[in-house]
Amino acid sequence: YFIENSNEEELIILLKKYIYDDLIRQFEDMLNSRRLQLHISENANDKFIELIDKISYTQILTLCNRVAVFFSDKVLTGNMSKSMAKNAALLNVSKFYDRAIQSDWTINHAEICHIGKELQFFIERILNKKTTILKDIASAENLRKWKNLEKDYNRQTAYAEE
C-alpha cells in the first residue's frame, strides 16, 4: 500500500535516510572496534550525505572501513591523537573518495553482511527488493531500473512456465 501511494522521490528520500543511518551506525561500530569514536560535524556530515548521491552503499562502506583502519594505524603509531581522529574521521571518508576519483582508482564494493533491521525492512518489505540493490546508487533512475528488472524477470518466468 505504501509503495503504491508514494512517488519515486519520496521513496528515494526514505531509502537515502535509511542508508545514511545504517552507514553511520556501521562506521561508528568500525571505529569503536578500534577504540576510536566518531564526532559528526555539520560540514563533514554534509559531505558524507553527498556521497550517497555519488556512489553506492557498499562502496561507501568500503571507504568507511579504509578510514577506520587508517586512523587506527595513525593513533597506534602515535602520529595522531584520539581526539583528532574522532573529529576528522567522517570528513576523511569523503576525502578518500575525492582522492580515489582524482587518481582514477576503482572503489570496491564491501560485502553486504550486517545491514540494519530498518534498512533491510525498507528494502525487502516496502520496496519489495533484495538487499543487493545496495550495490547501486540510491536514485530515482535506479528505482525505475529495479522496477523494470522485476518486470523483465516476471516476463521471463511467465515464458518459462508456458
Model-derived segments and their meaning:
Residues 1-162:
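Basic, alpha-helical nucleic-acid-binding regions used in initiation and control of genome expression
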